[in-house]
Amino acid sequence: MSDLIIVGVTGAPVSTRVVDWAIARAVERRQPIALHSIVGGVLGAVGEDAVLVHALEATRALVETHAQRVRAAGVEVSVHVEAGNPIAVLTKASESAGLLVIGSDYRGPGSGKARGAHGIRIAAAATCPVVVVPDVDTGERHGVVVGVDGSEVSEQAVRFAAAEADRLGEPLIAVSVWTPLQAPRNDLAVYPELYLTNMQAATEEIQALALAGIAVDHPDLEVVRRVVRGYPSHVLNEVAADARLMVVGTHGRGAIARFLLGSISQEVLAHLATVTAVVR
């Protein structure tokens, strides 16, 4: 896997936090950074050329200010500014990257339904792990949360989260969520106690197996285990509200909790509680 960290830069305030996050990781792991900024909305309208030239120049100047901060930290950096579709360009760029870092309000400021839509689509399409950074100060928070469901992609998420927790000197908080089967006529949500007990036990076993190899690679890592009944995205965001980082998989095939981008992972990104990595 490439060591290159690609960073999506926009004019949104969150871009400063995005670049700062990437710098911190690059310094510790001696990784190069490529700053990418894409001017979208090109339609080929009459008179558009002059507007596009100005937009590209202004964007290049903006990105260069961030590049100066990267250089000041002693990190190798390259700058890439172009016109195009941000989702397509960053997705293509991810093919040569080890990590892609973007801001949560990639489409700009606001709080409507479109907020974060580009980030969700990029996380779904990128070929490398994607880190989505919210415009929130997480400096006083602690812990790295990871969603665990026993699937293959969940194993990748656990490995990524454990490495980050070790790097940051933070505890790894493993969260597994189970949800009782939904029956149309079970409106009162009444379930046999034996069933609930067995669901809890089965999920605990799945989590234990998923975490079994952590101590070998990270012998000094503190691991906190949480197995909770509930809805996965709600539980994950609740736990992550106090964490420095959360890690989820792009999809899952486990019977306990499926982290499907477009469902659970999408909901996590749409209501971002902290810096969140989506791993495939």
Residue ranges and their predicted role:
Residues A34-H36, S78-E82, V131, I173-V175, ...:
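General small-molecule cofactor/ligand-binding pocket signal
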Residues M1-D49, G143-E193, A215-D217, E222-V223:
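Small/aliphatic-rich secondary-structure junction motif
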Residues V101-S104, P129-D135, A277-R280:
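Short beta-strand elements of ligand-binding domains
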